[in-house]
Amino acid sequence: MVKEKYTRFERARIVGARALQIAMGAPVLVDDDGRLDPLGVAIAELKAEIIPITVKRKKS
């Protein structure tokens, strides 16, 4: 499996979308370690590379 490198814009969009999902009641995929804010949990999921969001890019 190839580790995908995201641009800063993709990371911002992914974290924002996942934080919204968590705030709306989606299950958390990492140990929260006392984090209560959805943004912190979304960032932890991205760092752990288990965030359930994919990026589709145009082929050039």
From Swiss-Prot:
Identify the enzyme class.
transferase
GO function term, MF aspect, one: DNA binding
Q: What is this protein called?
A: DNA-directed RNA polymerase subunit Rpo6
Q: What is its quaternary makeup?
A: Part of the RNA polymerase complex.
Q: Which InterPro entries match?
A: DNA-dir_RNA_polK_14-18kDa_CS, Pol_omega/Rpo6/RPB6, RPB6/omega-like_sf, Rpo6/Rpb6
Q: What is its EC number?
A: 2.7.7.6
Its biological purpose is as follows: DNA-dependent RNA polymerase (RNAP) catalyzes the transcription of DNA into RNA using the four ribonucleoside triphosphates as substrates.
Q: Which organism is it from?
A: Methanosarcina acetivorans (strain ATCC 35395 / DSM 2834 / JCM 12185 / C2A)
